[in-house]
Amino acid sequence: MGLTGKETILIHSSMKAIGEVEDGADTVLDAWMEYFADGLLLLPTHTWANVNAECPVYDPRSTPSCVGLLTNLFRRRNGVVRSLHPTHSLAGFGKGAAEYLAGEDENNTPCTPGGAYDRLKDCGGKILLVGVGHERNTYIHSVEEVLNVPNRLAAEPMELVTILPDGTEKKVYMRKHYNAMQPHISEDFVKLNQAFLDCGAVEEVVFGDAECLLCDAKKVFRVVRHVLAPDPECLVTKTEIPAERWRNFE
């Protein structure tokens, strides 16, 4: 894959796609944590499926992740730090994990500009999609927030509660992803597949049995900005994005 192990890397994954591994998911996590020990390994530990207006409490020590087996095992490992974002937390291991994830309890949207997702583009960050596609690439939500794409967030916030490390409760007002035309906005991110490949922002690689996409965060940001510039809502409103849209990308 051309990775040195010193990168800041966010991995979205499907254990099922990786295939049979001796000792299963723990072996996969061991490999990632060992390889990226001199970098910063990030996994999503989202809770949007089980933290909401009806069930508003997020405790980073105990609230389960809703995005897969590997993420739930990872968040409980020694040395792993979990952010305080009540719906779109990340867990990190390695160099500067606590510092990188600090302040996420101040966010009021899933991927607030200046937050942990956005800063991937500023630190040479990578995103590795293991056995999943861009429909699971939360970073694109972040890009849309930075670009202020309309009709991506609910008008009214939810009132949530984050349990801080000292046990105190912090009230957080969080707007969730929402679009009246498309209840699952990220499903349309796959319309950018060819643009990313053609523009050199994404490389097709393999991990185990899983087909993977290795993304450069800064390049992904630039491609999305370029493609959306003439029609910011096109990912939802158009059935496909014509290649002419990125043919002159530099």
Please annotate each region the language model reported:
Residues 1-8, 120-123:
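Glycine-rich phosphate/diphosphate-binding loops that line cofactor/substrate pockets in enzymes
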Residues 4-54:
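N-terminal active-site beta-alpha-beta segment that forms phosphate/nucleotide-binding
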Residues 12, 141-142:
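Histidine-centered active-site/metal-ligand motif
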Residues 26-28, 143-148:
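Short, solvent-exposed amphipathic alpha-helical segments in soluble enzyme
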Residues 37-38, 150-184:
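Short, flexible loop segments at boundaries between secondary-structure elements
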Residues 52-141:
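Internal, conserved structured core segments that host functional sites
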Residues 55-69, 94-97, 173-198:
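A broadly tuned preference for mixed-charge, low-complexity surface segments
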Residues 175-250:
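Acidic/aromatic/glycine-rich contiguous surface patches that form carbohydrate-binding/processing clefts
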